[in-house]
Each structure stands twice: as structure tokens, then as C-alpha cells.
Amino acid sequence: MIRNDTIIAQVTCPGKSAVGILRVSGIHANQVAFAVLGKIPKPRFATYSKFFDESKKVLDEGISLWFPAPFSLTGEDVLELQGHGNPFIMDLLIKRILCLKNIKIRIAQPGEFCQRAFLNGKIDLIQAEAIDDLINSETESVVRASLNSLHGNFSFYIQKIIKKLIEFRTNIEASIDFSEENIDFDFNIFIMSNFEKLNDKFLKIKNIVSEGSLIREAKRIVIVGPPNAGKSSLLNVLSCRDRAIVTDLPGTTRDVLYENINIHGISCEIIDTAGLRETEDKIEKIGIQRSWEMIKNSDHVLYVMDKTISLEDQKKTSIQFMKQISSYNIQEVTFVLNKNDLVEDFCGITKIENLLFISISALTGQGIDILKKHLSNRQKDKSQEGLFIARRRHIHQIDLSYCELLKAQKNWLKYKNIELLAESLNIINKLLGEITGEFTSSDLLKRIFSTFCIGK
């Protein structure tokens, strides 16, 4: 897609720095090169250059890079000027270029370089979003997963499903167009076999994207338990600061407290909640209700108990809690036995009837490293090579596609209607195509790229 305008932006951060970089992209980039450099640099070579103003006086000097279309970031002619990172010099160069006569050039909008790369087929929409995720990464896991998406791992999975859908639909539509010809295989077995293969592919990618979403958006860990078990003390220890008020009075915490922390490279949102108990206090009741809401929306629950209670009560309490949350979609539950300093017992991990217990002391710090390692390892087990970043819109589209597949299978078993099946497969194809950008509205593109920085 060739545009009739040219864009320019500073791609390095504003402010003083050793190097400042300007990027120009569009059909007039060559004229900008002639005006500012006096020539077009050798393609894809770093060329030492002087940057001239309109009166041919030197504004700055540095490196120029020329990438002729279509072999560039955006697929258009691209000129990069790398000079000294003085904001005043950067502004003078930008003004110089914007004031060039007979050239339609303007400041780039946020994410417009990446948007042009997408529109010109240099990257798909998943890769464009991965660039934004990579820039905003705060942990090593997010960096590696973003790079996997940028390198096309996520797109590869989506394209594999789309390819299978097209192959399936082609055979279906062939049977519609040439229904009078004999088909040398059991048609129903063929269709059910394809449903099974597609179902396996969807379940695999649904599992991967749910893990990728956790990496991008941080693991939500909710601390719950009875009053005075040490929930707030645990929050303070994990966050390495006095985030919550701690007293000997039951019910001190009456509202939800949030703290974002990094545990061994894993981004986590730790949530402290009001103690779970029966109470007549209206304010405390509201806090307890919010505690249950947090539990429902958590990725990992840390149920804190006082280790001084009997083993029988520990077991009874844990089993009762698991029954209470049996209908919730919670991935992990860990029972934390606090106040180990009062019993001077083993500090570590134990299992009782498939329930996991970790003994700690929030007061002395005993077992905290073990707990942190447990929390990070559970996530790192899912964060190996091949995992990619997934956004909410990706998960939503995959869920819609999978629901349509299940619906198509149900309708086939009920009606055996080939036209209806072919149309369902076409719908699934379009839903998945919205993830990569093959079928995407301009409003969605605008919303996605508007979150990017101007230089990208």
C-alpha cells in the first residue's frame, strides 16, 4: 500500500542523550535525503554524513542510513539520521525537514511506522503488538515471550489452524460443487476426523495463550485466611515494605490491598484481603465479601493459617476451603502455615492428600525464600521457550472460534448439512484472521496502534 504522504519522528526518547535518531518513511524520503544530506546514502550501509540546514550550514553530523522500498521496516523508502542527542538539535532537524517545499511530510502518529509495516505486509498484527509488548516489558519472561511473538511463533500456531480450516473447507465445498461424483471415502468419518484434529489444535493453543496472558498481565496472587493468621504480615514480607497495617486485633484489614512485585523475574500482583469469618460488623462484612470476589478472580490463592493450631484442624480447614471454592476456576491453591517460629518445626513444603502446605514465619522470614521459589517455579515451568505473549483480544477471538467449532460439530451431528458446515468453517477462519490482521476493522487498528509510542 503506497501512501502519498511521508512521516517523520524522533525514535529515541526525548531529552538529552549521547545519540538522537530521526526516522523518515514515505515516497518523499529520497527528497529529504537530498535536501539534508546532499545525496542519497548507499543502501543499507552506515554512512558518515553532515546534516545541512536550508542555507547549507551544518546543523549536526553523524550517521545516515538509507533503506529503499520494499526492503525496509515499513516497506517504504526509509531514511534514518543518527546525530547527537541534544533536544535542540533534534528540533532543528525536524523543523528543517517539515519546512521542505513541495513535499507532503508530517509528524508521525503513535505507532504509525509499525502500522505502515503491517499495512505493507512486512509484519502481521500479532507481531506489531509484540513490538509494543517488548518495549513495555518489565520482566525477563515478558521480554522472551514478546520476542517469540515478534519472531512469528504465535502467528505460526494461528496459521496452522487456518491452513487446516481452509483444507477442510475446500474438501467440503468440493463435495457441494461436485456432489454427483462418487467420493471414495466415508464422508462422515472424514468430517469427524477433521473436527477431532481441529479440536486438538484449539485446546493446545488455548492452553498456551492462557499462560502467555498470565506472563503479560502479571500473576494474580490472593492472600486469604482467617483473621490474625498473618496475611498482612506476609504481604509486607513479600513486598519488602510495610504495605499493610499489622496489629493483634482480629479484623484489622477490612479492605483489599494491592501490591505489584517481581518474584525471581516473574511479575506478580499480590492482594491482601479481609479475614474470612462470620461477623455482624457491616463494614467487615463488605470486606469479607470482597475477599471472596478476589478469590474468584485469582490465578493463585495463598490460604494462610496459624501453624499453632492442631494438625487435625489444619486438615479440616483446608478441606473445607477447597469445598467452598470447588466451583471456582482457580488454577492453584497453596496453604501457608504461618508462625513457624512459635512451634520451632520443619520449615518447608509438605503434601497432605494432594494439598500443598508451606511452613513459614512472616516474623522471622523463615521459609519465605521457599515460598517465593514455589511461586516463581510454578510460573517458570510454563514460561519455557516457545511461549508467546497473548493479549485479551487474542484470547477472546480464540474462544469465539472454538465455540463456533463446537457449534459446527453439534450441528453436523444433528443436521448433516454440508452448506451449514462450510459456512461455520468460514466464520471460524474470519475470527482467527482478525488475530493476525487478515480480517480487521480500521477502528481496531486505530485502537491498537494508538497505544504505541510516536517513534514506533
UniProtKB/Swiss-Prot annotation:
Residues binding K(+), per UniProt: N228, T247, L249, T252
Entry keywords, A to Z: Cytoplasm, GTP-binding, Hydrolase, Magnesium, Metal-binding, Nucleotide-binding, Potassium, tRNA processing
GO terms of molecular function: GTP binding; GTPase activity; metal ion binding
Keyword Magnesium carried by entry: yes
InterPro entries: G_TrmE (IPR031168), GTP-bd (IPR006073), GTP-bd_TrmE_N (IPR018948), GTPase_MnmE (IPR004520), MnmE_dom2 (IPR027368), MnmE_helical (IPR025867), P-loop_NTPase (IPR027417), Small_GTP-bd (IPR005225)
Binding site for (6S)-5-formyl-5,6,7,8-tetrahydrofolate: R23, E80, K122, K456
SUPFAM superfamilies in the record: P-loop containing nucleoside triphosphate hydrolases (SSF52540)
Domain of life: Bacteria
Cellular location(s): Cytoplasm
Residues involved in Mg(2+) binding: S232, T253
A Pfam family of this chain: MnmE_helical
Binding-site residues for GTP, renumbered to this chain: 228-233, 247-253, 272-275
Cofactor mode of binding and number, as noted: Binds 1 potassium ion per subunit.
This protein's GO CC annotations: cytosol
TrmE-type G domain: residues covered: 218-380
Entry cofactors: K(+)
Role of this protein: Exhibits a very high intrinsic GTPase hydrolysis rate. Involved in the addition of a carboxymethylaminomethyl (cmnm) group at the wobble position (U34) of certain tRNAs, forming tRNA-cmnm(5)s(2)U34.
Family that this chain belongs to: Belongs to the TRAFAC class TrmE-Era-EngA-EngB-Septin-like GTPase superfamily. TrmE GTPase family.
UniProt protein name: tRNA modification GTPase MnmE
Organism encoding this protein: Buchnera aphidicola subsp. Schizaphis graminum (strain Sg)
Top-level taxonomy: Bacteria, Pseudomonadati, Pseudomonadota, Gammaproteobacteria, Enterobacterales
